[in-house]
Amino acid sequence: MTQTLPAGLTVTARVPASSANLGPGFDTLGIALGLYDEITVTTTASGLNIRVEGEGADDVPWGPSHLVVRAIERGLESAGVWADGLDVVCRNVIPHSRGLGSSASAVVGGLAAANGLAIKLDPELGLSLDQLVQLSSEFEGHPDNASASVLGGAVVSWSCAGEQADGAPAATDIYSAVALKVHPAIRVVALVPGERSSTAHTRGLLPETVPHRDAAFNVSRGALAVVALTERPDLLMAATEDRLHQTQRAPALPLTTRWIAVLRKAGIAATVSGAGPTVLALTTEPFPVELRAQAEAEGLQVLELDVADGVRTS
């Protein structure tokens, strides 16, 4: 039975950015980054009021089709509650369409806010972390970014076909993820270009098949990445090598590709962040001052970021 939330309940969700793939872990590996959007949701007597501040304020719809609103509604439905009206304020810091998981963060933040409202009504109605991973991944189609924003740290994610009770295929896959505790010596630097990238476009550049040797190469590097991230950061250079997607996307990301080469030549493990165009660098040393100056002179924003915890509500 659906319960109605009283007017006047307020929850704020603070949700981190994320980077997916980390080189070899295409659609599998992710990491939460210390760059945060905030979503404040208040239940009201009727209607929907939404306000967007910061990134995307002039680009996203201010209405029921907004991704955060859709995620809130899905979260309320999953928790078995309903609100007669909602006031939603989105304070966006994560750059949009740059490969930093802004859409996943919007979804996770909306779901977490809805979950927080349900818990205020009855703690027994709260959704588990596994449920939040599942729900957020359904929006995205794969859980690498979404699960990183839910769980924090680095994540290994996967999916499998779901089944109904009668054995027929389910309408959605089953999504899962486990969090990894990142080695404390690892530093994260994001080099963010001014231009945007389309995930759909860059995915369209990928071939339908790959040579067996390239698949085997990425399997080895993906396994090594787990070791490098948690225990052996000295292996990050080898652990971030890839043959499945970065070279294939290079024509669409010339600045990104060039900067990955520059950083790797300097001994810094660098990859495309998600679908780009942001460059993700993983290192155990301070980022070189001269490289920062060079990047900024070319219009790149250089962000030194912590590895973040997962979404939090208050």
Curated annotation (Swiss-Prot):
Name by which UniProt lists this protein: Homoserine kinase
Matching Pfam families: GHMP_kinases_C (PF08544), GHMP_kinases_N (PF00288)
Swiss-Prot/TrEMBL keywords: Amino-acid biosynthesis, ATP-binding, Cytoplasm, Kinase, Nucleotide-binding, Threonine biosynthesis, Transferase
Molecular function (Gene Ontology), one example: homoserine kinase activity
Superkingdom field: Bacteria
Cited SUPFAM superfamilies: GHMP Kinase, C-terminal domain (SSF55060), Ribosomal protein S5 domain 2-like (SSF54211)
Subcellular location: Cytoplasm
Species lineage: Bacteria, Bacillati, Actinomycetota, Actinomycetes, Mycobacteriales
Similarity field: Belongs to the GHMP kinase family. Homoserine kinase subfamily.
